[in-house]
C-alpha cells in the first residue's frame, strides 16, 4: 500500500476528509520551499501537491502562472524540485508528496529517469496536467512500477467513458476540477459537484479530491461534505505572493490549520 493509499485509508477509518494544499516549488523564495512544505504538514495537510514550474502552464490561472514565472526566473528546475522533496523527507517520512505539472519537463528529464529519481527523492504521486488518460497508460504503468501513484484530472465535462478510462489507470486519488477554465477562477456550485461525484465514484476505485475555486474555510467545508478531499492552490500561492517574507511560513501554517479545523468540523457534523 502506497503512502497516499495509507493516508486515505486512515482518513476513512477516522471519518475525516483529506486536505491537499498546493504550492509552487521555488516561489516566492527557492530557499523557503522545504520550510513551506513543513508548515503545510504542521498545519494539518494530509497530502502536499508541489507544483513543478513550467513556462506555459495552460491549465493555471494568472496567480499560479505568475508563481511559475517567478520560480523559473530564479532558476528552479525539475531537479531542484526533486531535491526539495529529498530534503523534506529528511525529517518527514509520513506526509505524501505529489508533483503536479506538465509533460515537457518530465519528458526532457526522461520518463524512466524521472520515475527512478522521483522515487529516490521520496515522491509519492505525480499529476501531469497535459497527459490525457487515453494516451497515458504506459506512463502510468512506469510510475506504478516505481511505486509512484499516477493521478489524473476529471472535469465537469468528462464523459462517462473518460471517467471509466481514468478509473482503469489512476491510483492514489483523482482530482476533480470543479469548474471549467483555469485554476483560481469562478464561483463554486457545490450542488453541481455533488451531482457529478456519484458518476465518478461508480467508475473510479480511488478517493476523489475536489479543487479549483476553493478559497476559504467555508468553501472547503462545503466541498468536503460531498468529496473525499479538498484541494486548494491558488489561494495559498496568493497568500505567499502577498505575505511579508518574515511572516510567510507562519501565515501559511495558520491558514492551513483553519482549513483543517473546518474540514474536521464538517466530518463531525456528518457523524
From Swiss-Prot:
Which EC class does it fall in? Answer: lyase
User: Where does the record place the catalytic residues?
Assistant: 49, 60
User: Which pathway does the database say it acts in?
Assistant: Amino-acid biosynthesis; L-tryptophan biosynthesis; L-tryptophan from chorismate: step 5/5
Show the catalytic activity: (1S,2R)-1-C-(indol-3-yl)glycerol 3-phosphate + L-serine = D-glyceraldehyde 3-phosphate + L-tryptophan + H2O
Give one Pfam family, short name only.
Trp_syntA
Keywords recorded for this protein, A-Z: Amino-acid biosynthesis, Aromatic amino acid biosynthesis, Lyase, Tryptophan biosynthesis
Q: What EC number(s) are associated with this protein in UniProt?
A: 4.2.1.20
Which GO CC terms are listed, alphabetically? cytosol
Q: Which GO terms describe its molecular function?
A: tryptophan synthase activity
Which InterPro entries would you find in this protein's record? Aldolase_TIM, RibuloseP-bd_barrel, Trp_synthase_alpha_AS, Trp_synthase_suA
Q: Can you tell which superkingdom this protein's organism belongs to?
A: Bacteria
Q: What does this protein do?
A: The alpha subunit is responsible for the aldol cleavage of indoleglycerol phosphate to indole and glyceraldehyde 3-phosphate.
What is the protein's quaternary organization? Tetramer of two alpha and two beta chains.
Q: Which family does it belong to?
A: Belongs to the TrpA family.
The entry's protein name is Tryptophan synthase alpha chain
Q: Which organism is it from?
A: Burkholderia multivorans (strain ATCC 17616 / 249)
Lineage runs:
Bacteria, Pseudomonadati, Pseudomonadota, Betaproteobacteria, Burkholderiales
Q: Which gene encodes it?
A: trpA
